[in-house]
């Protein structure tokens, strides 16, 4: 039977939902999210306030009753219990011992045996208390190096003495005092559209975890959850036969997201993008690729992050003039493994949407602009699914994940008919809407359709909020459709002035899955990856075997051992000739060269 227990402490009143057959451990797990301490050996529970009791029986610690059920403790719906503890108790997970020291002066909660004497923890051996990570600091996960680097910085923005200052060189006033990285005026003055992820994180940390409350911790990041709880235990039938305020999602108000997980997309060399676009130039069909690169610090935005693209891998696909279809990609684990050996990972996707203008001057049609759309509704949903598949790992969320650093880049026509890349992400709200199956595409590319209710989906009230021409906030109903721009976050993109790409072979290798380019052509073999193309690449480049597509092809051949493949990747990454000499002396490399000689 479901019931509610009430707890009163010096930090406030708490309500906990449970049932009579659950152990007190489930109650403590919920209390741990609200209490400023996790040392359960020092927290006493009583049915009288201030540890005062006429019967003279002893209070019990939370630790001593963890394994007893609610019915064994003779607790009823609505019972009020009092918690006593000290804020000076150190934080940390506590391992329980076989007995606990009890404080006197409070009446004990009745156990099944009715005894009010000293209690002991059940079990002869020590056990560890299950404590929510939010009670004692960030969770322990492996973040990206760039996140660890930015975590160690405060991001404070220094300002020089200005003409408004009326003090000496060692003074400070409101015109020259440092600013936090999320300062709104700084963002507007420097034309920064969104604050960075780590600036937003610092802002949330300052809001939820104040220094004077160092004994408590609240995870500052949380992904929105818009799905109904199909396993609600509030005593009603499961949805759709029953519903309550606890299991249904709250009303949703969509706003333009104020922060972005990645601020900038940089292609390490213009040839990376140029080679990708050449498919459209040759055939007129569209193309899709995965961006492999790394994340680095971006100095033009406070605490900013940029994704640096070193290679575009084109998976199996069926391309058409106005779209494409992705096919099964069986080699994805191999490609990811080679990228990891090189210090790279998937950072996003890229696809073309190009139509020749017909002017015979190399210009293309401009189809994406403020009066049409930037990403279509289906592309927004696709981007959200990719972001969900590639979450951002962070220690500042209870589940260790918050949104994503995965980028979506579309290559289309600019306002002057030029070919240009445009990079986007979708908001964390978009990810939540897609997870809950609330949105889908519509016949208008710029509009997103809101689904209706069904047996597994409950759609709450949804509104979107925008600022009108008078500077006032206006809310509109999002049903049945709403503009897709409310789910978009735009990035900047560029090429470096002084490019230093990782892959610098003199002659590029054949790019995968482009066999159709040579159809009906006497040079068709130039678009095939085979033993002949591998041997030709080695002959033309000598020792400069610095090409991602060639590395992946060699790995798929399965001739080199794991150690030899790692050595080859190390040589490509660090470009130390000693590693190349060591590779040449290995048995697998000699076998590899022998096979190439015999097959060509």
From Swiss-Prot:
GO BP annotations listed: cytoplasm protein quality control by the ubiquitin-proteasome system; DNA replication termination; endosome to plasma membrane protein transport; mitochondria-associated ubiquitin-dependent protein catabolic process; mitotic spindle disassembly; mRNA transport; nonfunctional rRNA decay; positive regulation of protein localization to nucleus
GO CC terms: Cdc48p-Npl4p-Vms1p AAA ATPase complex; Doa10p ubiquitin ligase complex; Hrd1p ubiquitin ligase ERAD-L complex; nuclear membrane; perinuclear region of cytoplasm; replisome; RQC complex; VCP-NPL4-UFD1 AAA ATPase complex
Biased composition (Low complexity): 109-128
Alphabetical UniProt keywords: Cytoplasm, Endoplasmic reticulum, Membrane, mRNA transport, Nucleus, Protein transport, Translocation, Transport
Location of the region described as Disordered in the Swiss-Prot/TrEMBL record: 109-140
Record flagged with keyword Transport: yes
GO molecular function: K48-linked polyubiquitin modification-dependent protein binding; ubiquitin binding; ubiquitin protein ligase binding
Keyword Cell membrane: no
Domain of life: Eukaryota
Domain MPN as annotated: residue spans: 265-402
Its membrane topology: Peripheral membrane protein
Compartments where located: Cytoplasm, Perinuclear region; Endoplasmic reticulum membrane; Nucleus membrane
Function, as annotated: Involved in the import of nuclear-targeted proteins into the nucleus and the export of poly(A) RNA out of the nucleus. Has a role in the endoplasmic reticulum-associated degradation (ERAD) pathway.
Family from the record: Belongs to the NPL4 family.
Protein name: Nuclear protein localization protein 4
Species, as recorded: Lodderomyces elongisporus (strain ATCC 11503 / CBS 2605 / JCM 1781 / NBRC 1676 / NRRL YB-4239) (Yeast)
């Amino acid at each position: 039977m479901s019931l509610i227990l009430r707890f009163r402490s010096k930090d406030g009143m708490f309500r906990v939902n449970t049932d009579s057959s659950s152990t007190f451990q489930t109650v403590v797990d919920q209390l741990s999210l609200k209490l400023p301490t996790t040392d359960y050996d020092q927290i006493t529970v009583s049915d009288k306030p201030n540890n005062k009791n006429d019967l003279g029986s002893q209070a019990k610690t939370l630790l001593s009753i963890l394994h007893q059920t609610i019915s064994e403790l003779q607790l009823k719906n609505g019972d009020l219990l009092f918690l006593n503890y000290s804020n000076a108790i150190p934080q940390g997970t506590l391992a329980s011992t076989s007995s606990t020291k009890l404080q006197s002066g409070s009446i004990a909660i009745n156990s099944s045996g009715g005894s009010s004497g000293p209690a002991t923890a059940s079990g002869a051996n020590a056990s560890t208390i299950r404590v929510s990570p939010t009670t004692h600091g960030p969770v322990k996960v492996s973040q990206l190096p760039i996140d660890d680097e930015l975590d160690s910085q405060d991001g404070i923005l220094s300002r020089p003495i200005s003409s408004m200052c009326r003090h000496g060189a060692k003074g400070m006033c409101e015109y020259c005092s440092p600013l936090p990285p999320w300062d709104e005026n700084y963002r507007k003055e420097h034309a920064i559209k969104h604050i960075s992820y780590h600036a937003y994180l610092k802002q949330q940390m300052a809001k939820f975890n104040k220094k004077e409350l160092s004994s408590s911790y609240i995870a500052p990041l949380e992904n929105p959850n818009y799905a109904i709880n199909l396993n609600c235990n509030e005593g009603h039938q499961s949805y759709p036969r029953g519903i309550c305020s606890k299991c249904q999602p709250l009303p949703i108000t969509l706003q333009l997201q104020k922060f972005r997980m990645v601020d900038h997309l940089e292609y390490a060399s213009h040839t990376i993008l140029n080679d990708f676009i050449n498919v459209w130039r040759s055939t007129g069909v569209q193309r899709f690729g995965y961006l492999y690169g790394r994340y680095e610090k971006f100095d033009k935005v406070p605490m900013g992050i940029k994704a640096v693209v070193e290679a575009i891998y084109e998976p199996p696909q069926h391309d058409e003039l106005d779209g494409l279809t992705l096919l099964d990609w069986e080699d994805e684990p191999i490609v990811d493994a080679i990228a990891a050996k090189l210090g790279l990972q998937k950072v996003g996707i890229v696809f073309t949407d190009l139509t020749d203008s017909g002017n015979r001057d190399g210009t293309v049609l401009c189809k994406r602009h403020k009066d049409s759309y930037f990403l279509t509704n289906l592309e927004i949903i696709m981007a959200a699914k990719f972001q969900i598949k590639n979450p951002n790992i962070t220690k500042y969320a209870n589940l260790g994940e918050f949104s994503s650093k995965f980028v979506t880049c579309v290559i289309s026509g600019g306002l002057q008919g030029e070919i240009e890349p445009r990079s986007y992400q979708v908001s964390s709200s978009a990810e939540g809407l897609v997870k809950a199956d609330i949105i889908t595409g519509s016949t208008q590319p710029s509009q997103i359709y809101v689904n209706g209710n069904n047996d597994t989906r409950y759609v709450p009230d949804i509104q979107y909020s925008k600022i009108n021409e008078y500077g006032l906030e206006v809310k509109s109903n999002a049903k049945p459709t709403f503009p897709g721009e409310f789910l978009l976050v735009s990035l900047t993109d560029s090429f470096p002035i002084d490019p230093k790409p990782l892959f610098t072979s003199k002659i590029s290798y054949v790019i995968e899955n482009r066999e159709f380019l040579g159809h009906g052509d006497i040079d068709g073999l130039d678009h095939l990856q085979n033993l002949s193309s591998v041997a030709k690449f080695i002959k033309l480049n000598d020792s400069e075997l610095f090409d991602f597509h060639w590395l992946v092809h060699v790995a798929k051949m399965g001739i080199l051992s794991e150690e030899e493949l790692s050595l080859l990747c190390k040589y490509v990454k660090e470009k130390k000739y000693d590693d190349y000499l060591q590779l040449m002396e290995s048995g697998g490399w000699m076998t590899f060269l022998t096979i190439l000689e015999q097959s060509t």
